[in-house]
Amino acid sequence: GVQTCALPISVVDMRYENPHYMAEDAGAADLIAGGRLQLGISRGSPEQVIDGWRYFGYRPEDGQDDAEMGRRHAEIFLELLRGIGFAKPNPHPMFPNPPGLLRLEPHAEGLRSRIWWGAGSNATAEWAARLGMNLQSSTLKDDETGEAFHIQQAAQIRTYRAAWREAGHAREPRVSVSRSIFPLVSDLDHAYFGNSGERGDQIGLIDANTRAIFGRTYAAEPDLLVEQLRQDEAIAAADTLLLTVPNQLGVDYNAHVLEAILTHVAPALGWR
């Protein structure tokens, strides 16, 4: 029911965020949601404008680029979520203060362990593991070896898990991957996605220096779809699968797609 359903949000571009404001907002949202917030953050994606974060008052430190600025904002945000006091109290406050240094309020206990980092490379997946963030790996990543997308993504997940173990965190990490999956069970499915499954991974440039590999769309009759998904190494390596849906096709059609996956695909693969 609604009481146990997670409230996932992803991904927030940290280049544009004030970590202190964001810690307040995230804490409030998690408390309102009863501790169900699963918050995805990242360094952001290619944009419509040049250096849009500058208009929000942010700039990288000397020698840093905007990606490093986004990661710095994330590190500050994570530190604030620990709820450890850092600000000196006013000796003559308007309202009585608790003893010691003050933290940001509202503080949501446990939210720190429900932050996910959207990693586009193996290096940032390792960095996220060291900081104790869960891993969110999408339908694209940096093309680091020239291998198939799912193989590179599975390697990224292994790299992340190894870094997590090395960091000595007490809890087990969460790992999600995203996929576009369409069981072809109706004429409409065939009309929309009948040819999509024949295309493989795509290669493209997401900025001047970054060659990326984009994962294929899975679209086939249910039996074939199950066989194809069984061979996806990254799905096997993750504990959570996020489904990307074509929002522009409307609520009813997307509900049909999800229902078809739950009925025709998930049981055969042991998904729940």
Predicted regions and their residues:
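Short, small-residue-biased leader/transition segments that mark boundaries at the very start
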Residues: G1-L7
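Conserved strand-turn element in the central/C-terminal portion of the radical SAM core barrel
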Residues: P8-R15, V177-P183
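Active-site mouth loops of central-metabolism enzymes
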Residues: S10-H20, E109-A119, A212-D223
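Flexible, glycine-rich active-site loops centered on histidine and acidic residues
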Residues: M14-F86, L135, K141-D143
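Short, acidic/polar
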Residues: D25, G120-E126, P222-D232
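C-terminal amphipathic alpha-helical "assembly" element
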Residues: Q38, S137-A154, R158-R272
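Extended catalytic-interface subdomain
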Residues: D65-E109, R114-W116
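A conserved active-site cap/scaffold subdomain adjacent to cofactor or substrate pockets
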Residues: A123-E144
